[in-house]
Amino acid sequence: MVVRKRMNRFLLIFLVCLSAVCSLYSQGDYENGDIYLYGETHGVVRILEKEIDIYSGYYQEDHMRHLFIEYPYFISYYLNEWIQSPSDEILDSLYEQWKGSASYNPAVKEFFEEIKKHCPQTVFHGIDVGHFYWSIGEQLREDLEENGMSETEEYSKVIKSIEQGEVYYETGDSLFREQMMVENFIEEFESLEGESVMGIFGSMHVTNKDPEEKNRYGNLATGLIQTYGDRVHTESLTSLAANLLEDPMRVDTITIDGIEYEASFFGRQYLKNILPRFIYRDFYRIENAYDDFSNKKKNSNVLPYNNYPVQVQTKDVFMIEFCLADGSLERQFYRSDGNTWNDMPVTEQFLL
């Protein structure tokens, strides 16, 4: 089990890393190699398919081999082991450990499988802070120690990624996360000695590319442009998600008031930059449930149809699961009675 470090250690790590990032931002000219960043809405099939198409083009036509991803170093280490393996055992293990995250989505797993199938010489570079440091990160640390690799560069990167994850999950500091992503990206990119790369990240990390117009936290693209200038190219793919989903990403079974229901999952929306109290919300449509909940007392909360990633019909019932800033989960239930608010069709929250 990982023992949580004292806050003074977190502060020390933060200051050291921040100093390193500031130094990297101000470095001089670099030669060769462009950076192509694509912003996504996580887990959307149309976007994942487009990303495969774009990367395959770079891979086949431009001989690009390096794909930067929104995962920590230790996950990309395992992905690189997996892509060279004849089996999918490593990916299967990672996928099971991604439960509870946006990566636990069959479309995401299929994305990696397609990369392995069509672009088998790909090298993944994970540059995010240490998400899953308590499980996957510690697992790799132990694996390397058992194999006598505790003095290697790989081991140092694993420890660094774990420590970044500890700081981020202790403080919730999004500025720290963005700055670490910039530092980690630059470190990996510079090690390639002039090769061009593609990166896939959530749109909030990519779309704000003007250093003079920083968003609330700054972001990855801003930091990279400060270092590499017009060698950084950004494009948002989020418009591909504008069309509402027709089919669920998966179907779960949940129990409400002692009764089991099928719950169709329609995706996750990240809220931290919009509503600081929340990290994200997950949308579930509870199938064939309206009659069971139509008489439940409503409160005054409404949620317009345009908040949902799927077409809403009268007599639909939804469960929205919020992840709060402290990591706790809160479930809210809404139903569509065909009512409007300010001339907008809305769902209304009801109480269990």
Region annotations inferred by a language model:
Residues 24-352:
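Compositional signal for N-terminal targeting/processing segments
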Residues 12-21:
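Bacterial N-terminal signal peptides
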